[in-house]
Amino acid sequence: MTMALASSKAFSSIFNTLSPINQSKFVLACSGSNHVDVIDRRRRIMIFGSSLALTSSLLGSNQQRLPMESAIALEQFKEKEEELEEEEERNVNLFQKTSPSVVYIEAIELPKTSSGDILTDEENGKIEGTGSGFVWDKLGHIVTNYHVIAKLATDQFGLQRCKVSLVDAKGTRFSKEGKIVGLDPDNDLAVLKIETEGRELNPVVLGTSNDLRVGQSCFAIGNPYGYENTLTIGVVSGLGREIPSPNGKSISEAIQTDADINSGNSGGPLLDSYGHTIGVNTATFTRKGSGMSSGVNFAIPIDTVVRTVPYLIVYGTAYRDRF
């Protein structure tokens, strides 16, 4: 069908290139002298034959070139498609490997009875806020942001509870109460402890943050707005940033990223392309009143976390030092 169309256009092009004189001769020959008709017919046959030969040659070369160009384009498309599939597969594998280490944290306030007694049933409690965290070790230590559990940390009336939901190494989901082990408001870090009851947990694999480079890929996993196990992808946008801590001091060497960190992502891990934890997601700049990520987000560098968490696990934070 394509060749028929090409030949038709070629013939039309050939006919239209004839001069008005030749065209008028052709018309006159059809209506008059036989001598003129024969001469003009021979001349026209010669012109048509030469043009047709040229057209056939051009079409033949195009026929040879077009399939070759199409084959190259198709091969390039397949290569790009395979690259995309490989990248997607890497992202899927990274998420499947690391998400079992991420926990969902609910800050719960227990209700009081009319007589002032506290109801200890968490099912009747009010969820004051949600956040994220990650499994530090197989003993049940959980790392999160201080501001995620600040109400529990400063509770003087026994009204606050912390519920930690996660999966064990077998993929079984369970929830336990998180008890405070240690706090570091200066760096917006906290360590909780849950009872494992013989379950095997999935601790994160720790990376380093001192060798990060702007432009490298990074991945944030958390529970934004209560949507558990949400993955967002971006790059390291900046290094050595300074951000405020919950107590008004400054956290230095923060990692800036455009991977979305929304409300509920706080405390979750920031990962590199190998699935190693390189930071703790903690803050985002938002437009006033929107509460949504602006693409300027921050994480506490893992080197700071590695210096802080073991100390908190060993020495803890005395209750009197929380206020």
UniProtKB/Swiss-Prot annotation:
Top-level taxon: Eukaryota
Entry EC no(s): 3.4.21.-
Active site, per annotation: 147, 188, 266
Location of the region described as Serine protease in the Swiss-Prot/TrEMBL record: 186-283
Location of the transit peptide in the chain: 1-28, 29-73
Principal place of residence: plastid
EC class name: hydrolase
Keywords: Chloroplast, Hydrolase, Plastid, Protease, Serine protease, Thylakoid, Transit peptide
SUPFAM superfamilies the record matches: Trypsin-like serine proteases (SSF50494)
Family note: Belongs to the peptidase S1C family.
Protein known as: Protease Do-like 5, chloroplastic
Organism: Arabidopsis thaliana
Source taxonomy: Eukaryota, Viridiplantae, Streptophyta, Embryophyta, Tracheophyta
